[in-house]
Amino acid sequence: MRLLALLLLIPACPQGTGNGYCEQDTDCSGGQICARDMECIAPGDTRGVKTTWTIGGQAADATTCATMPNFYINFYGADPQDAFGFAPVPCMQGQFFIDKLPTRFDQVELGSDGHFDLVRRVDASGMASFDLSP
């Protein structure tokens, strides 16, 4: 009977036991936060990363971005299967900032279908910079 009562209670327990799926910090427990890849992780295992780009050495604007108005951005770690990203990312922004990125993601891929696909390492200051060819 006790086993049955325990089994009935288990589904009511919150998922926040660490390394689980989350949508916000309150979905996590034990001082963990919800990283941008939707996993619970210790705050010290995350960082902010800023990706910037220019086109032929020029600032991103309506003229320099005319042939490629939107990009995709992906973040990778040592395991190529461990990745996630965002699209569309407007070229004219000239930058993309992400906070609460797990530190295991140490590479940024910036691409535009039919134009380019480049990868850079995130440097010690949390930056990845690209100069794209027009």
Task: Give the residues covered by each predicted segment.
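Structured interaction patches on ligand/partner-binding surfaces of diverse proteins
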Residues: 89-90, 111-134
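Short, disulfide-bonded extracellular cysteine-rich repeat modules
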Residues: 32-43
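C-terminal motif of bacterial Sec signal peptides marking the signal peptidase cleavage site
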Residues: 10-12
